[in-house]
């Protein structure tokens, strides 16, 4: 979620982009399995991104009309750019158009004012009505006969892995998608130079020489942390009609035992990858396989990355109960509660070396006032505070929450606590930092027997996701 203030500076009016990551069938269509194409369409259109206009009127934030407000879903026309655009791995015999985005998790914001939404667990929306090609790539990305039991493949052939006319439809998902919040007619663009994997988020910063840098986590146990560096100054590239997100290099991280690290080049110019892949389009479509071949460090579920004002990069590693052998960067085996790692790149984010350290272990907070588990969302403010959101089973009798850490002292304080079985996710602020937007996702996991939130208790209504507006009573900076 990101707030785009009107004229780049308004504290009371702007566009809010919000991801709709997933909705279970029982929650959205009222039954465990779809029984028709209409059921599938309803489920599909509950996924995607909303772009809404907000205004603070008399102290109350509310939606207002705007020609740029829109809903982007699984059947919205999209386009591809970068090295994979026009590649054979995106072609289907059905010659169907490029459509949709799904399982949109976290996000990023470009310096030119566009929204980057990240496709995460896209594999779960595919299934098979018959035999299908169980390729190495499909196995690595987690495709299966039933997926996550959405059942779309039963009524929509695009998501049927056994339908040969749509053999490459699965390759059309797993990308970072760029959306212009101030142009309702813009076609969302899948930026393929950033790789294809289970994108959690896209932390954007500007490095040496004005080059654009994007840090990204692949949200699965034993997967990797990536960064993308544009080939030139981002302003210069845009002035020449080039997208900084289309031209540059992708890297994957290797964390060494001595507290140093290396960014390994994920390009076809790398001899290791030239021996395994036909071209750069294939390297990027199968980014996970490329990173495997390079010997990147398997991490404990890399989720949000964020760049602090001092240049340090933080990344949440949510948990990994399946880890049996610890290493320096993932030193708890099993890692049931997660940790946060930080690093500092050389050459102002554009180099290939870095130094790293563990910022904190969630397990170490248990039994204290600072207790939390399963760190997920991250946002650093300019004053050295790190806002941390959680998405798993909390210890010490708590629900999911948002805590604030002092990055200098390590002190933690709780700012927000959610309802049962929800996830605290998304964070956006107005330019003056006196208004903070956050979300609760899938309260009660969509089960009205657990909670009716935000409806009054006992009303019988299905629980709904909610965006909260947080301000201080004294009008000060939130979190201070």
Predicted features and spans:
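Conserved small-residue
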Residues: 1-480
